[in-house]
Regions:
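Mid-chain, well-packed structural core segment of small domains
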Residues: 50-68, 72
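Short S/T/G/P-rich N-terminal loop/turn motif that feeds into the first structured element of a domain
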Residues: 1-47, 55-58, 80, 84-97
Length: 97
């Protein structure tokens, strides 16, 4: 299953985070250890979006927790599917035959 994880840092916390570049690199390293499909950083806001392919949420608990601690906010976690995978999911759910 693919998951999209999105975190945002408010301006006040952002100043604290930017003063700890080693913590930012540590967080990025934890996500990179999962070989993400993609990692994106907003150029206009303090946001980070990561897309991982994992069997379940347990696989990325450590970087998720590190993100929560660093940003002082709960990241959003969305299970997602590609347009090619979506019909199979609908079929498993009994929505289409």
């Amino acid at each position: 299953m693919k998951y999209m994880i999105h975190g945002e840092i408010d301006p006040e916390t952002g100043v604290e985070v930017e003063a700890q570049p080693d913590k930012i690199q540590e967080l990025i390293g934890k996500w990179q250890a999962l070989n993400p499909i993609g990692m994106y950083f907003s150029l206009t806001r303090r946001t980070m979006t990561i897309i991982v392919d994992a069997p379940n949420e347990d696989a990325f608990f450590e970087p998720l927790h590190a993100m929560w601690v660093l940003t002082k906010d709960y990241p959003d976690v969305y299970p997602v599917a590609s347009v090619d995978e979506f019909p199979q999911i609908l079929q498993r759910a009994g929505i289409i035959g």
